[in-house]
């Protein structure tokens, strides 16, 4: 059992009590909500005559169903418009902060909370979205939850949870040129598997993470859930504090100094005990691309689709399904695979540093004939900052479409969808069957820079050849 880790310290400091089931009743410091998983939760509160207990600890935005082109109301999609009206009504009725379209603060929930300073070290955070683990980059313990749990947090500001084990994932060294945070987490998931983290929280540590920016750390923690871990986190340090200082909701004045003292105290102890430890060498991590139908089916961009005999016996059945669905043959090079659509964005890779790296590849080049490529900033703030730097002009000159903020084609609950058997190069987090809007559409996950390279070449391409 882990002891002396950040996870233990934050968990213990937020424990309200132990339940007869053996679970912990955990206080939730920040509850983030959006338009998809909150309407039913609010309806259940109304049915029981309950109010939101701590509206000041609840923040809402719209992201999943938001069009990234025509955002005029009412939306063309009736269901999307209904969801918009519901979250507008629910937040107004309950006195909850709501970052609506055009407010300057709207965007993907896991992008806007950090950029506003809402996400802070030592917090417990919940959201009705799988990728809530993103916020662990700040040294928070953040859980994705279902609609019934959204209801519970709204009503009681607590969750009933079983305590997780803690796995230390140590990555040391400097990443090679052309290798990014996205490659790090895809490599980890490829190695440990999509179920390898079940029952665990992942603590990401080592000199590689110390060298990362906060946005890079967010990319890694975002996809901890794809490796089966309920949450992932990085211990807060000077990089964390510098990022937070001066942001809208960050502590100010004397409160800032008090916060720093607390944040430093929750760092995992030097002699902390872990339930498992895994180590990686940063120098050995390549630009990585998924070839199959889970984020764990990944290979280096210069490798071939693995053959069944190269796999563990338990992985072969899923691989056979992936070969058929993706129309890729064992032994086939992934480089050179034709691409139809290129998507840069999402809560994984829709931040400024992601757009800057992609723009470096796009600048002075042009999207290949027959390829549809578009860039979706993770928030309205990111969009404005990118435009101030001229990134929009670089992308547009290269033939990319420049869109409004939203989840877009990460999950296609909006107009941005694949058509038929199209195959996409995507900077998002999931490559499940039908994930991007077409029941037969195919997705290859990779870093934003790799997506930009694929857009230019028209095929999966090693980004290092364009640097």
Q: How would you label these PLM feature ranges?
A:
Residues 1-467:
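Fe-S-dependent hydro-lyases/dehydratases of central metabolism
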């Amino acid at each position: 059992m882990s002891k002396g880790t950040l996870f233990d310290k934050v968990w213990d400091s937020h424990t309200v009590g132990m339940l007869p089931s053996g679970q912990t009743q955990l206080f939730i410091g920040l509850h983030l909500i959006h338009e998809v998983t909150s309407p039913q939760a609010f309806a259940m509160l109304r049915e029981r005559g309950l109010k939101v207990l701590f509206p000041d600890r609840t923040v809402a935005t719209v992201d999943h169903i938001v069009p990234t082109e025509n955002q005029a109301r009412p939306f063309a999609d009736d269901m999307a418009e209904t969801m918009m009206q519901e979250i507008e009504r629910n937040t107004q009725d309950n006195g909850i902060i709501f970052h609506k379209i055009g407010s300057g603060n709207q965007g993907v929930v896991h992008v806007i909370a950090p950029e506003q300073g809402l996400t802070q070290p030592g917090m417990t955070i919940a959201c009705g979205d799988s990728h809530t683990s993103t916020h662990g980059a700040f040294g928070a313990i953040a859980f994705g939850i279902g609609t019934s749990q959204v209801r519970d947090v709204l009503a009681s500001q607590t969750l009933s949870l079983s305590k997780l084990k803690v796995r230390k994932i140590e990555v040391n060294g400097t990443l090679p040129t052309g290798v990014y945070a996205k490659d790090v987490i895809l490599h980890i998931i490829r190695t440990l598997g999509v179920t390898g983290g079940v029952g665990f929280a992942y603590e990401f540590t080592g000199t590689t993470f110390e060298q990362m920016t906060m946005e890079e750390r967010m990319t890694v923690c975002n996809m901890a859930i794809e490796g089966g871990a309920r949450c992932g986190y990085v211990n807060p340090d000077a990089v964390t504090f510098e990022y937070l200082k001066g942001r809208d909701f960050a502590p100010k004045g004397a409160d800032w100094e008090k916060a720093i003292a607390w944040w430093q105290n929750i760092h995992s102890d030097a002699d902390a005990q872990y339930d498992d430890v895994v180590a990686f060498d940063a120098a050995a991590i390549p630009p990585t691309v998924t070839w199959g139908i889970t984020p764990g089916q990944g290979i280096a961009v210069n490798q071939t689709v693995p053959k069944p005999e190269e796999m563990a016996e338990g992985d072969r059945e899923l691989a056979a399904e992936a070969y058929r669905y993706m129309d890729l043959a064992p032994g086939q090079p992934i480089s050179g695979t034709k691409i139809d659509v290129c998507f840069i964005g999402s809560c994984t890779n829709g931040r400024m540093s992601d757009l800057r790296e992609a723009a470096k590849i796009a600048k002075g080049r042009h999207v290949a004939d027959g390829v549809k490529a578009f860039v979706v900033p993770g928030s309205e703030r990111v969009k404005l900052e990118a435009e101030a730097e001229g990134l929009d002009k670089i992308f547009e000159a290269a033939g990319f479409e420049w869109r409004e903020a939203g989840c877009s084609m990460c999950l296609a609950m909006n107009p941005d969808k694949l058509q038929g058997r199209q195959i996409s190069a995507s900077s998002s987090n999931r490559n499940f069957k039908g994930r991007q809007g077409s029941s037969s559409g195919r997705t290859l996950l990779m870093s934003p820079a790799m997506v930009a390279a694929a857009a230019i070449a028209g095929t999966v391409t090693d980004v290092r050849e364009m640097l």
